[in-house]
Every structure is written in structure tokens, then in C-alpha cells.
Amino acid sequence: MTSFDFLHINTEIVGDKVVGNAGGVLGKMLQSYVDQFFEKINALKVIAKVNGMHVYNLYNPPFPSQAGMRFLERKLRMMLYKVAFPVTANLAITHKCQCQCIHCSADPFIDPAKKELTVDEIKTVVDGALDLGASLIIYVGGEPLLREELCDLIQYVDKTKAIPMIFTNGLLLTEENVRKLAKAGLFSLNISIDSSEPELHNEFRAVPGCYQKAFEGAERCRKAGILTGISTYATSESIKTGKVEKVLKIAQEQG
């Protein structure tokens, strides 16, 4: 039993703001920290509302939610015990990918001679991450949609503890796959867009039509209720020349 078994936090939305009231034995002592936490949260822009919950970014759980309370508990543990606890677990579930990106961050770590983790092994890692306090489980690759057990792995994530996310190139976001992802409980995903110019994006990834398919897939995901963001490759040059800003503008235009 930990000290937090004696702390009960009730959260609600009042006037479009999230408020938390700490009870239990530790409630009075920690209320000021809870107030500070939600003061920072409420200063952020609400980018989406899902089932009465506020979403501020794709890397933290929505509030109020059970996963969000775990996120807050992690903050309190770090403050009291002076020990860092992970908030995110990035799990590379496959090295397979249809693209051959010139800037691939995974490529240096890929060894075809090594076997991929089994589903049971991945689930064990997920369990361990949740036990450590992670509130976000991200499946990456390679291309995670090339792993046929992806939906099973998404469904396995205990939604009362964490939210599941994937990073994808968008090529396999068909109507059927998006429906399966939504049914499995995928909360959000990031689609890779490397340039505001379709030709350059396709060239970077060595896949003709990749740009169009990515945005078509993004639209399907939004319609299915999956929060959808864009992941882009940035360099100091692309930032200075405004190329990254153009990608962000397209993301806003696409919704």
C-alpha cells in the first residue's frame, strides 16, 4: 500500500475549466499542488473535446479521466519522492516499412537478423511500462500497421491507465483498417508529413502517391473519431526557411 491509497481526487469541468479536489488523509497537504497542476493545465489550449473530456495535446491523457489521474499521480510522486517516473513508452513493434526514408531515425537500429518481439513479449513490456506509471503507450516501427496483431496490442492497453497512440506513414489507413483501429480503442495517431510539397514528400519516402494517401487516411481517422496529428522531419534549415511552418499550416487547413 502506498501513500496515494489515502488520496482521493475528484475532478470535474466547471466553466470550461478542469478543477480537482483532493480528499483522504493526504488531501489537505496536497491540495495546493493539485491546484497548481490544474492551473497549468487550464492555461493550455483545448484542441479537442472527447466524451466530455478536454484534450490539450496528443502526448498527455485527456482530463478528467482515469488515465489523466494517473498522470497527476505521477507528478505528485515525483514531487514527494524526488524520483523520476516515465510518462511515455515508445515500443517499436516491427522493423518492416513500405518507405525508404532518407532521414529514417529507426534505420540505424534495424537488424534483419534479429527476430521481432512476440505479441506476448510486447504485452509484457506494456505491463511493465504501466506498472512504472506510464500514461501513454506509443506503437511505432517501421510501420506499425504492417504488424497484423496491432489492433490486439492497442486493445490490450488498459484505457483506465494509459492512452494508446501510433505513428504511421498513412499508406495503410484504409476504411477497413481505420474502422478496426477505432474499434480497438486507438485514441490518437500521428501521420508523417515531411514537406508541404507532395513531390518532395514522395521523394523523401521513395513512394509515389504517399502524400495523397496520407491525407486521405487522416481524413478517415478524423471521421472515425481518432484524434489525428502530423509528425514532421525538421532541420535547422527547414525551420529558418519556413518549410516547417508551411507543413504546420497545411495541418491546420486539413483540420
Regions found by a protein language model. Give the residues of each.
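Generic detector of short, locally flexible boundary/turn motifs and exposed helical patches
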Residues: 21-23, 52-59, 66-69, 79-80, ...
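Short N-terminal helix-initiation segments at or just after the protein's N-terminus
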Residues: 28-36, 102-107, 164, 171-173
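Flexible, acidic/Gly-rich N-terminal and inter-domain linker regions that tether
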Residues: 1-87, 99
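Canonical Radical SAM [4Fe-4S] cluster-binding loop centered on the CxxxCxxC motif
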Residues: 82-120
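Radical SAM/AdoMet-radical enzyme domain recognition
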Residues: 119-139, 147-255
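Generic structural motif
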Residues: 61-62, 96, 196, 237
